[in-house]
Amino acid sequence: MKAFHLLLFHGSFIFPECILIFGLILLLMIDSTSDQKDTPWLYFISSTSLVMSITALLFRWREEPMISFSGNFQTNNFNEVFQFLILLCSTLCIPLSVEYIECTEMAITEFLLFVLTATLGGMFLCGANDLITIFVAPECFSLCSYLLSGYTKRDVRSNEATTKYLLMGGASSSILVHGFSWLYGSSGGEIELQEILNGLINTQMYNSPGISIALISITVGIGFKLSPAPSHQWTPDVYEGSPTPVVAFLSVTSKVAASASATRIFDIPFYFSSNEWHLLLEILAILSMILGNLIAITQTSMKRMLAYSSIGQIGYVIIGIIVGDSNDGYASMITYMLFYISMNLGTFARIVSFGPRTGTDNIRDYAGLYTKDPFLALSSALCLLSLGGIPPLAGFFGKLHLFWCGWQAGLYFLVSIGLLTSVVSIYYYLKIIKLLMTGRNKEITPHVRNYRRSPLRSNNSIELSMIVCVIASTIPGISMNPIIAIAQDTLF
């Protein structure tokens, strides 16, 4: 009985995660006892469990930080805001996937199970407080990601993407564990983050070569999840070969979860090596912003262009990680990631809607889409303009606050690179918008001429997600202050 009460006590700290686990069990039960005609229930249960989990998080807001499960899991506002972002991503991605699944005849239950399980892994990673949980949680996320990326088994590109993703993911995980082993040994056998720092102080190993090896290895391992340059090789192939709803899901959730983990790992165990990891991240940010935006200009595939764009975007996010909580770096990073979720998913909503109906992903094949589907074209244009940082859209104010925090922290060169590459990104975003809005008959492609709005009920779900994303992407600057204030409350 005592063990049962202890389980209930610790379980109360992971109540949002328990809701998702219950949703997973319910999905399996319904799928095994009903026929294919009851598929709307599967979407309903998945979306409801995600919304209920978000509600549970909001009710727990501003509670005192707590450590549960013998120090393995930490609950505080900082972790919960990242969990909220992951849940928000998943909630918006499920409506985006309805039409794609119907058109491609993918297995629905397994798809939803993998999405919810990956979400669960990302949430546990946000609250992980020891090395074992920090390793197991992203592996849970990664395994589901591998399965989702190869979900269309008959597609050669999907199989190629999965193979590359799996091999590079396995290699990065082994490098990450290697770094953890150096931390574990140098700290005298500690696995909790704060205890590792205390152990390094006691053993006088915080400036040893072993810590440098650990720092490099962990940076490489986490870099695979964030996909900054030069750890970006898998990103374009996975984006191009994977099903579009899967790409939309992975493009945001993996970065949110990895950012939450990176801030805690770099800020606590490597407290005495701040100059070293700042330098490493500055190099990654510069390479990401330059390579990501320059290579994106040359792409002809919409998904590959967004892949390189995401590499550049993570360079901006890294600026917030480097600044830290001293100059509102974390607050600006959280705010920008919230806007990035809406901007990116809104852009992918267009691809999900256009791709299955036309069978193309080429950027030039979108020419003249405004003449056939004005809502889709205008919504896409707003999201792309926000990604480029055009005022008065949300992306502009998100970047402005992020760069201002970096400037105040003395990262003048890094911010200058960010400003220049943002200007470069505007070029290829405007190029796409020009194609979308063209009305010249000579430029309108056969794919657009034959384009038909879907009569399926699933079209409404895509439009619902897109409306939410467009509204969030076009929030004017007057809403920035309360958003920044909420983000500042999350600092640990």
UniProtKB/Swiss-Prot annotation:
<dbReference type="Pfam" id="PF00361">
    <property type="entry name" value="Proton_antipo_M"/>
</dbReference>
<dbReference type="GO" id="GO:0019684">
    <property type="term" value="P:photosynthesis, light reaction"/>
</dbReference>
<keyword id="KW-0793">Thylakoid</keyword>
<feature type="transmembrane region" description="Helical">
    <location>
        <begin position="400"/>
        <end position="420"/>
    </location>
</feature>
<feature type="transmembrane region" description="Helical">
    <location>
        <begin position="209"/>
        <end position="229"/>
    </location>
</feature>
<keyword id="KW-0472">Membrane</keyword>
<comment type="similarity">
    <text>Belongs to the complex I subunit 2 family.</text>
</comment>
<keyword id="KW-0874">Quinone</keyword>
<feature type="transmembrane region" description="Helical">
    <location>
        <begin position="466"/>
        <end position="486"/>
    </location>
</feature>
<dbReference type="GO" id="GO:0042773">
    <property type="term" value="P:ATP synthesis coupled electron transport"/>
</dbReference>
<dbReference type="GO" id="GO:0008137">
    <property type="term" value="F:NADH dehydrogenase (ubiquinone) activity"/>
</dbReference>
<feature type="transmembrane region" description="Helical">
    <location>
        <begin position="165"/>
        <end position="185"/>
    </location>
</feature>
<dbReference type="InterPro" id="IPR010096">
    <property type="entry name" value="NADH-Q_OxRdtase_suN/2"/>
</dbReference>
<keyword id="KW-0812">Transmembrane</keyword>
<feature type="transmembrane region" description="Helical">
    <location>
        <begin position="39"/>
        <end position="59"/>
    </location>
</feature>
<dbReference type="GO" id="GO:0048038">
    <property type="term" value="F:quinone binding"/>
</dbReference>
<comment type="function">
    <text>NDH shuttles electrons from NAD(P)H:plastoquinone, via FMN and iron-sulfur (Fe-S) centers, to quinones in the photosynthetic chain and possibly in a chloroplast respiratory chain. The immediate electron acceptor for the enzyme in this species is believed to be plastoquinone. Couples the redox reaction to proton translocation, and thus conserves the redox energy in a proton gradient.</text>
</comment>
<dbReference type="InterPro" id="IPR045693">
    <property type="entry name" value="Ndh2_N"/>
</dbReference>
<keyword id="KW-0618">Plastoquinone</keyword>
<keyword id="KW-0934">Plastid</keyword>
<feature type="transmembrane region" description="Helical">
    <location>
        <begin position="6"/>
        <end position="26"/>
    </location>
</feature>
<feature type="transmembrane region" description="Helical">
    <location>
        <begin position="106"/>
        <end position="126"/>
    </location>
</feature>
<feature type="transmembrane region" description="Helical">
    <location>
        <begin position="329"/>
        <end position="349"/>
    </location>
</feature>
<dbReference type="GO" id="GO:0009535">
    <property type="term" value="C:chloroplast thylakoid membrane"/>
</dbReference>
<keyword id="KW-0813">Transport</keyword>
<keyword id="KW-0150">Chloroplast</keyword>
<feature type="transmembrane region" description="Helical">
    <location>
        <begin position="277"/>
        <end position="297"/>
    </location>
</feature>
<feature type="transmembrane region" description="Helical">
    <location>
        <begin position="377"/>
        <end position="397"/>
    </location>
</feature>
<protein>
    <recommendedName>
        <fullName>NAD(P)H-quinone oxidoreductase subunit 2 A, chloroplastic</fullName>
        <ecNumber>7.1.1.-</ecNumber>
    </recommendedName>
</protein>
<comment type="subunit">
    <text>NDH is composed of at least 16 different subunits, 5 of which are encoded in the nucleus.</text>
</comment>
<feature type="transmembrane region" description="Helical">
    <location>
        <begin position="81"/>
        <end position="101"/>
    </location>
</feature>
<dbReference type="Pfam" id="PF19530">
    <property type="entry name" value="Ndh2_N"/>
</dbReference>
<keyword id="KW-1278">Translocase</keyword>
<feature type="transmembrane region" description="Helical">
    <location>
        <begin position="305"/>
        <end position="325"/>
    </location>
</feature>
<keyword id="KW-0520">NAD</keyword>
<dbReference type="InterPro" id="IPR001750">
    <property type="entry name" value="ND/Mrp_TM"/>
</dbReference>
<feature type="transmembrane region" description="Helical">
    <location>
        <begin position="131"/>
        <end position="151"/>
    </location>
</feature>
<keyword id="KW-1133">Transmembrane helix</keyword>
<keyword id="KW-0521">NADP</keyword>
